[in-house]
């Protein structure tokens, strides 16, 4: 199996909510590696996010998503009466329109078998064998993936890669602690027009 396993992903509307956002739900301008990893697990029907620890992902943006802001009703139950007006408040949320990107998968350092790369290969070759549920989303359950398909690139082609950079302005999670924030792991990035190189790969790990 080839080490380079590229997929083209298209999502009409998405919000990659910043981890520290509260009343105003700001979005990251690009999908974080942790979010893309979750989508790939869902694609193959895997519910254990630890199953493919060690996989490496490389993400390249093909579009510059348009940002907009919507207002919606956010409910939290402070009063027993569900219709009490104090249980609802306006919630502003940023949305991205037309998110298109490439994700390359490298399972050479995974320990479990079959690897995520092998399972994705099987999902596209024999989709009837995949046991999964729900729509395929990128982030929130509302943000359905419109298309995910095999893609062909060469290692010397230039794309706008999400590149690790200690001075980068994008701080994104590659592993999320859903119980609290203490276990969430971060990496700094910048978008760089380049060919595939070691700095564009992010390994999914818990440390």
Q: Where are the model-predicted features located?
A:
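Solvent-exposed loop and beta-edge segments used for protein-protein assembly and interaction
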Residues: 1, 51-53, 95-97
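N-terminal, Lys/Arg- and Ser/Thr-rich interaction peptides
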Residues: 1-21
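Generic beta-strand structural signal
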Residues: 5, 55-57, 99-101
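Primarily extracytoplasmic ectodomains and periplasmic/lumenal surface modules that are beta-strand-rich
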Residues: 14-15, 46-47, 110-113
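Glycine/small-residue-rich interface belts in oligomeric ring/scaffold proteins
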Residues: 20-82
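Internal, well-folded beta-alpha domain core
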Residues: 64-207
